[in-house]
């Protein structure tokens, strides 16, 4: 009788214990170490890194295509784990508001025109000096050297990091008044310009007046006659159809239009070393792709704009010299604001 009672009592204890263990195993999926398994699907979602990139030019420009190429390569190099959402044409932010948006963390990457921020980062004023670079190869040699490091460090005081520079190319002049070949041809012209006191000053030295305005307002300003001239790269002139409201294009190669690719430094430091390496590699490959596109698209744009009836003029050596002499005083004005290495560079490149 006693044995039966003990057996019965054991059964009452065993049943709840067995049920409890079963429920824990079935619902909690206990592993030998006592930890709950994680949902693999949820882990996959957590592993995906999504970044938003904003820029203000058209998708069919070198920068627009480079941004798409960057997004594609980042996905490929990460096995689909890194997703870059690209917003072109100022869809998220204008070229005036995008830097502050990046500082606030409202966007992850931007590629603004350096010229819009030369009053904030005075080192970048060197990039706006007319005729300071002979060509894109010369420019790349400078940006990839010690002077390039100084230029990249400028935004760090705002908590931003320059990853590298992308290019749009060298700038040309368009107008609907007359061909611009000599400094006196600038007199009476009204230029839309970027937010750069350096650009304002060299156009003033050439005899023109200027109106600062965001990039996406350039076409309406030209169309309505509020300005009659502008400077830009061939691909921007073509893709934004500026040439349709202008009569003359001067191939001057007088200035550089470049795009530092910027990130918020705090955001960048939160990324893993592997993710940073993937993004840098994708950006570098996109930059090389962009340079190839510039040469290809500029030739096509020039041909199609000429076919539309736009009058195209190329500066002669003597005309270029006249422009250089007219803007030479600006080199002295900029040099005194630069740290010693950049000052020496500006002084060495001053037109003689």
Language-model features and meaning:
Residues 134-157:
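Short, solvent-exposed loop/beta-turn-alpha elements that line the ligand-binding surface or hinge
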Residues 2-133, 162-352:
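N-terminal secretory/targeting leader peptides
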């Amino acid at each position: 009788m006693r044995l039966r009672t003990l057996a019965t009592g054991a059964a009452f204890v065993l049943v709840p214990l067995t049920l409890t263990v079963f429920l824990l195993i079935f619902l909690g999926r206990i592993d030998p170490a006592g930890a709950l398994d994680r949902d693999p699907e949820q882990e996959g979602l957590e592993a995906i890194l999504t970044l938003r990139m904003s820029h203000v030019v058209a998708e069919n420009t070198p920068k627009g295509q480079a941004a798409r190429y960057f997004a594609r390569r980042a996905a490929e190099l990460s096995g689909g784990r890194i997703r870059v959402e690209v917003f072109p044409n100022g869809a998220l932010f204008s070229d005036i508001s995008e830097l502050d948006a990046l500082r606030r963390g409202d966007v992850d990457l931007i590629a603004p025109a350096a010229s819009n921020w030369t009053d904030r980062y005075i080192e970048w004023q060197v990039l706006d000096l007319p005729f300071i670079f002979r060509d894109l190869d010369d420019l790349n040699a400078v940006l990839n050297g010690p002077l390039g490091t100084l230029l990249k460090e400028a935004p760090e005081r705002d908590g931003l990091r320059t990853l590298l520079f992308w290019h749009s190319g060298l700038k040309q002049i368009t107008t609907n008044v007359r061909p611009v070949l000599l400094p006196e041809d600038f007199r009476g012209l009204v230029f839309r310009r970027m937010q750069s006191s350096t650009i304002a000053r060299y156009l003033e030295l050439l005899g023109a007046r200027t109106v600062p305005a965001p990039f996406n307002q350039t076409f309406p300003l030209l169309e309505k006659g509020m300005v009659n001239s502008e400077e830009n790269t061939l691909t921007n002139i073509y893709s934004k159809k500026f040439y349709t409201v202008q009569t003359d294009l001067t191939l001057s190669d007088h200035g550089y239009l470049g795009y530092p690719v910027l990130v918020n430094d705090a955001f960048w430091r939160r990324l893993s070393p592997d993710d940073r390496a993937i993004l840098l590699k994708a950006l570098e490959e996109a930059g090389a792709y962009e340079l190839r596109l510039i040469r290809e698209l500029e030739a096509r744009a020039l041909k199609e704009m000429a076919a539309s009836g736009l009058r195209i003029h190329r500066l002669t050596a003597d005309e270029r010299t006249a422009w250089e002499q007219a803007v030479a005083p600006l080199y002295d004005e900029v040099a005194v604001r630069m740290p010693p290495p950049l000052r020496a560079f500006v002084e060495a490149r001053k037109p003689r």
